[in-house]
Amino acid sequence: MNNIIREITNEQLRTDLPSFRPGDTLRVHVKVIEGSRERIQVFEGVVIKRRGTGVSETFTVRKISYGVGVERTFPLHSPKIDKIEVKRRGKVRRAKLYYLRNLRGKAARIKEIR
């Protein structure tokens, strides 16, 4: 029974995703359906967490929009995600970057890996 579940979930995993970690800056291209139209919406921000394994793996991206912090959680293997681009590699020493929620401006910057 366990092997059957593993096979089915492995079929649903995507292989076209780049490797990324918390601290990296991503551009997530999401398919949005408005009425009868479908378009691509881009959400760019810093990965603050990544959790789960397999089909249930999710990641959260945070950005500042008009002075307000916006966080969005995406299922990693979702068909709604068109593509993911890694813009910058960040150097952090934590797996969960919740402390960024309390920082403003230049204090919220993350060092870039060269």
Curated annotation (Swiss-Prot):
Biological process terms in GO annotation: translation
Species: Halalkalibacterium halodurans (strain ATCC BAA-125 / DSM 18197 / FERM 7344 / JCM 9153 / C-125) (Bacillus halodurans)
Superkingdom classification of source: Bacteria
Record GO cellular component, one term: cytosolic large ribosomal subunit
Any GO MF annotation of the entry: structural constituent of ribosome
Cited Pfam families: Ribosomal_L19
Protein family membership: Belongs to the bacterial ribosomal protein bL19 family.
Gene name of the encoded protein: rplS
Leader sequence segment: none
Coiled coil start-end: none
Task performed by this protein: This protein is located at the 30S-50S ribosomal subunit interface and may play a role in the structure and function of the aminoacyl-tRNA binding site.
Protein name: Large ribosomal subunit protein bL19
Iron-sulfur is among the record's keywords: no
HAMAP family hit by this protein: Ribosomal_bL19
Record keywords: Ribonucleoprotein, Ribosomal protein
